A protein has these predicted regions:
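Extracellular/periplasmic head regions of type IV pilus-like filament subunits
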Residues: 56, 60-136
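N-terminal Lys/Arg-rich, disordered targeting/topogenic segments
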Residues: 1-7
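Short, surface-exposed interaction loops/tails
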Residues: 2, 123-168
Length: 168
């Protein structure tokens, strides 16, 4: 009889060890997903800084920001549209203002970059301007950028994203 109790005790110890290791793995893996999401959000911010610099160089060379070509409701999207190319990013690359294709790390309907050039008078802004947005971050963000006309606050159109606005 003592052998049976000893056997059961050893099995119980092993079971506790396996459960403990399983719990640690679950905690590690859930934290790992957060780390991956954070790194993708950091890349998104870095990409937008590169795109803003490239847009400024384009403006310096041509005296205006590039036009958007209405991939989707006036926006040029980093996901393209119906398999189309991303016009403003392609133009910046072709002109040598960026040296690689820039796209969101996930680059789908929820997570992408979008750009639109607006004319003077649109939404009450007196001069032409562009809006560049990160459509969404994976983690909540306190800094959502800036972009506003008298008739529309662009930051509110990408509530957990990031907005950049600049005027011609």
């Amino acid at each position: 009889m003592p052998e049976l109790n000893n056997f059961t005790y050893e099995r119980l110890q092993k079971l506790v060890a396996v459960v403990f290791i399983g719990c640690i793995m679950v905690l590690f893996l859930s934290g790992f997903d957060t780390i991956k999401s954070k790194s993708r959000d950091v890349k998104r911010r870095a990409d937008v800084k590169i795109l803003v610099k490239a847009l400024d160089m384009y403006h310096d060379k041509y005296g205006k920001y590039p036009d958007s070509h209405n991939d989707w409701q006036g926006w040029d999207l980093s996901i393209g549209y119906n398999g189309g190319k991303v016009d403003f990013i392609d133009r910046l690359k072709a002109e040598g203002f960026i040296d690689r294709e820039i796209k969101d790390p996930i680059n789908d309907v929820a997570y992408h970059y979008r750009y639109q050039k607006f004319q003077a008078g649109d939404y009450g802004c007196q001069t032409s301007f562009y809006i560049l947005q990160i459509a969404g971050f994976e983690l909540p963000s306190e800094n959502n950028g800036q972009g506003e006309c008298p008739e529309l606050n662009w930051v509110k159109s990408a509530t957990n994203g990031y907005t950049v606005q600049d005027f011609d």
